[in-house]
């Protein structure tokens, strides 16, 4: 959303301050919370590689909730994928109107911060995240099917090839030395990935472990497979979901 709206480009720098405090509310970055350190001024590629919340909080503030919601919907969040399985959830992309109708409250900047990092009231299935990942690295939103030989229709989202390459570069860096997905360091530039750690709504991190996420695109130059792993209440994505995804990808390579 930030790239396509023109709010940022590859060179735009945002300072990682470690935390943002608004009245009694605090929004922190994991690196500061765990180690007391900040990243300085970073661009989008570095922010993706390091999973830097402060960058995306500030970016979300620049872009605005409506633009974020628009692109989330374009990339398939908040709707069923249509896979041939019963009981699929459509998930939820919260909007200003949704919050007003559901809670009777207006939308606050803190809600935008949460939405910008995929938390708060946003909900999504692993399959939706896989489809969104495909859209991010290819610019296409595709149908999903269990049938190997089925004809899958894809819609071109009109994302510029330059912006796609910027995102891929950041996801490539996330799997390389210095990134958050240390399980994939040995794969070098051949894998794109993004780790995630999703907290339970309404609960603090010491009450229950967060959900561990990672989404992977392989091979990195022209992805043919998207792999998304979510482990319920397992901990951090880097430590828990990453090794599982690595094992699955390794087995897939053996039979490829």
Where in the sequence are the language-model features?
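Hydrophobic residues on the short alpha-helix immediately C-terminal to a glycine-rich phosphate/catalytic loop
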Residues: 1-2, 248
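Beta-lactam-recognizing serine transpeptidase/beta-lactamase-like catalytic domain environment
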Residues: 2-229
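Short, charged, low-complexity patches
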Residues: 129, 237-246
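Intrinsic structural disorder
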Residues: 132, 178, 241, 252-256
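Short, gly/Ser/Thr-rich active-site loops of penicillin-recognizing serine hydrolases
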Residues: 152-155, 244-256
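A generic structural motif
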Residues: 232-235
